[in-house]
A protein has these predicted regions:
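Short helix-coil junctions and helix-kink-helix linkers
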Residues: 198-212
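A conserved mid-domain beta-alpha-beta active-site/ligand-binding segment of alpha/beta enzyme cores
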Residues: 123-197
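Glycine-rich, highly charged phosphate/nucleotide-binding loops
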Residues: 54-70
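Short, conserved secondary-structure transition motifs
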Residues: 112-128
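Acidic beta-strand-to-loop metal/phosphate-binding motif
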Residues: 7, 77-88
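A short, conserved structural fragment
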Residues: 221-235
Length: 243
């Protein structure tokens, strides 16, 4: 693992790797929240909307982390991305890294949590024992795959909608906050009273939504329903719970 740089896209994934034998200095945390918000500022390796989802700064600069990643690629280090086909932010990170490194002759590998356990819809839902033999869990991306994922990233970048999510056909789709809010509010009109967790569960069953994390998807103007979960609702995350 000494010659491997690990790329993770959220704190829970970062925490999992730190519990394993992977050294902290080999981990690059790109918590960019690629599944929401305007992507255009990423050309400068920045995100400028994250205060809306709990960050205490207006702009987060990832320039140093990207420089570290590129320096290691130039030094022929292996790059391993931790991801999931069932988590839009983690899956988007694969597309982003492929686009970033397409012009380099980089060795890119991916570990998908849902290929290790069907219940693990995010890397952070794995247990450290499940990633002991990580070299046996990874798979190398072919050049053709890197090019394909890079094109997917460019397509999503050009579309640049408010939300990017994994649809039921396992592809990344885009939609606006207004579109999603309208669908949710129309569904909400069917109820006189309903618990947040139950309502979200029904939305998923009725294919109104799928794996969208409502604790994060908050309209900049403050969509009322999308804030309920942040104030203590059960949320819509599924998979294995850790206490």
């Amino acid at each position: 693992m000494e010659n491997t740089i690990e790329v993770v896209s959220n704190l829970s994934s970062n925490g999992l790797l730190l519990k394993s034998s992977i050294k902290n200095e080999n981990i690059v945390l790109l918590d960019m929240h690629l599944d929401i918000g305007d992507l255009k500022d990423l050309k400068n390796y920045k995100r400028s909307f994250l205060k809306n989802i709990g960050y205490n700064v207006d702009v987060v600069d990832y320039g140093n982390k990207i420089k570290f990643l590129l320096d290691n690629v130039r030094n022929n280090k292996k790059i391993r991305i931790w991801s999931s086909h069932k988590n839009s932010n983690e899956y988007m990170t694969v597309f982003y890294i492929c686009n970033l490194l397409e012009k380099y002759d980089a060795e890119l590998y991916v570990v998908y949590s849902d290929e290790i356990s069907s219940e693990a819809k995010s890397v952070g839902e794995l247990d450290k024992e499940e990633i002991k033999n990580v070299d046996a869990l990874e798979r190398k991306l072919l050049k053709e795959e890197i090019i394909m994922y890079s094109k997917t990233w460019n397509s999503l970048l050009n579309d640049n909608s408010d939300i990017r999510y994994i649809s039921f056909d396992n592809t990344i789709k885009s939609c606006s906050y207004d579109y999603l809010e309208e669908k949710i509010l129309n569904e909400l009109k069917k109820y006189n009273e309903v618990r947040v967790g139950k309502f979200i569960s029904n939305l998923k069953i009725d294919c109104i939504i799928d794996e969208i994390d409502y604790s994060e998807y908050r309209h900049p103007s403050g969509v009322r329903f999308l804030q309920y979960d942040r104030r203590g609702g059960q949320g819509c995350g599924s998979g294995r719970q850790r206490h």
